[in-house]
Swiss-Prot record:
Domain GIY-YIG: 12-88
Family as reported in the entry's similarity comment: Belongs to the UPF0213 family.
A Pfam family annotated for this UniProt entry: GIY-YIG
Name this polypeptide is given: UPF0213 protein DP2720
CDD domains membership: GIY-YIG_UPF0213
Species annotation: Desulfotalea psychrophila (strain LSv54 / DSM 12343)
SUPFAM superfamilies attached to this UniProt entry: GIY-YIG endonuclease (SSF82771)
Amino acid sequence: MNCIQRPETDRPAWFVYIVQCADGTLYTGITTNIARRITEHNSSAKGARYTRSRRPVMLVYRETCRDRSEASKREYAIKQLSPTRKRTLVKASEKGFSAIYFPSYSIKGQ
């Protein structure tokens, strides 16, 4: 499963995102508002504990998902990847490829 296309609904879109921290590490999360969440990571106590000591963070990847459940499953799958494979995913998205080209990144059994 990949969070590539989302049918039109009244519900807000959910996003899976990856930020690169100041120390070069990657953090993966989910949200309905990426701009707000990046601001929280960079400036407020609402940012993830992991990113608070690694500011500033920069958005390097995002996927749109149908709902929170799908976003959570995709987040889990990405968090299981090695740092090298996460960077491959980020680089592929920079070149215009979507996660659909990386079936090994999808959730097992889906």
